[in-house]
Amino acid sequence: MTLIDTSSWIEALRKDGKEEVRDRVRKLLLNGEAALCDFVLLELWNGARGDYEKKKLAQMEREIFCVSTTSAVWTLARELAIRCRKNGITVPPSDLLIAECAESHH
């Protein structure tokens, strides 16, 4: 299972998206290996414009596995944030959460 990040979904869904990204997402979908998480869905819904995009997102929610964002995932994301900050790196909270969601369901 591969958790696909928001930016990759956006590229894959665009008619003029990068072909390399579109191909990779397409292969994951065809092989039943694509996954979403709640935060990726939130980001996609937040950017959805018009009925077509909303229908597409609703279809994705029905058909693509969504990994759960458990309290353990939130704890891991906080711990990752602390480790990153100790090394002078500031990571957006959304990226920390998505990364730990992927890691915990790998």
Sequence positions of predicted segments:
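A general structural signal for well-ordered alpha-helical segments in protein cores
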Residues: 22, 41, 54-57, 74-77, ...
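Short, well-structured N-terminal submotif of metal-dependent ribonuclease cores
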Residues: 1-36, 45-59
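Active-site neighborhoods of divalent-metal-dependent phosphate/nucleic-acid chemistry enzymes
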Residues: 64-106
